[in-house]
């Protein structure tokens, strides 16, 4: 045992909770909660039957809780530093708009000529109009939480639910295959209804519709199954990693 090492504060709390003398864990080369959770619960109990006895399971559980809390705090601090650093860099590199815009300032009357006619009522002053319509608050919050992780919602579900056939192989299908594709699209539920609405046209030949609205002369929707083609013709941006085909026939737009 290295006598220069001392028990970590988190492990000291575990010692207090299970009522063992301070420094007991260090005698058995456990200096932090991470030394304990490197072993499975069963391994730890079996390896230390002689001294904590029946309290070994409780000691491992407490150590695991402390370790998880420390990991969460570490990740939160990392993310906070990353976001603050990006914001500070943006502010440092920004221009002084108050001085550079002299002579080109647009007054409020020009920018919002409707303000003079608005009534001071709750709807007028408190109504919030999202910049992205249709807007789905829960989906937007999920996307924001994953913004700095470079991981999609589909990736998270696929790692935790490997029983879904779609995640095992693209050639396999099942009840959840369509749901897996919806997760991969990064579109909110309301946005997903736009390209998947059924065709309500009574015309048998839709060539003129596709040429007028999407700029391609085609009798059916098949050219637009490729997401890049669909996005290019609509002049919209493909999300990062969105290079896969749409994959199902409901992609034809409603008319």
From Swiss-Prot:
Classification via Pfam families: VRP1
Keywords per UniProt: Plasmid, Virulence
Highest taxon above the source species: Bacteria
InterPro entries per UniProt: Insecticidal_toxin/plasmid_vir, Sal_SpvA
Transmembrane segments: none
Entry similarity comment: Belongs to the SpvA family.
The protein's role, per its UniProt record: Not known. This protein is involved in the virulence of salmonellas.
Name of the protein this chain belongs to: 28.1 kDa virulence protein
Natural source organism: Salmonella enteritidis
Gene coding for it: spvA
């Amino acid at each position: 045992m290295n006598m220069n090492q001392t028990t970590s504060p988190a492990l000291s709390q575990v010692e207090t909770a299970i009522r063992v003398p301070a420094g007991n864990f260090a005698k058995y080369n456990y200096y932090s909660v991470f030394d304990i959770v490197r072993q499975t619960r069963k391994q730890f109990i079996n390896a230390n039957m002689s001294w904590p006895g029946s309290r070994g399971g409780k000691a491992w559980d407490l150590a695991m809780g402390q370790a998880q809390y420390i990991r969460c705090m570490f990740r939160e601090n990392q993310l906070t530093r990353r976001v603050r650093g990006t914001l500070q860099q943006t502010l440092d590199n920004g221009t002084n708009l108050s001085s550079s815009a002299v002579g080109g300032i647009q007054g409020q009357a020009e920018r919002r000529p409707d303000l003079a006619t608005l009534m001071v009522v709750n709807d007028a002053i408190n109504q919030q109009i999202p910049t992205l319509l249709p807007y789905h608050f829960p989906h937007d919050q999920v996307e924001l939480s994953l913004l700095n992780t470079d991981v999609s919602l589909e990736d998270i579900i696929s790692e935790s639910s490997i029983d879904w056939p779609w995640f095992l192989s693209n050639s396999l299908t099942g009840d959840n295959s369509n749901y897996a594709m919806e997760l991969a699209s990064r579109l909110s539920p309301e946005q997903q209804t736009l390209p998947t609405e059924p065709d309500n046209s009574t015309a048998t030949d839709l060539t003129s519709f596709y040429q007028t609205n999407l700029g391609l002369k085609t009798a059916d929707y098949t050219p637009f199954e490729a997401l890049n083609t669909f996005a290019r013709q609509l002049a919209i941006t493909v999300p990062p990693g969105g290079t896969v085909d749409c994959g199902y026939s409901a992609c034809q737009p409603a008319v």
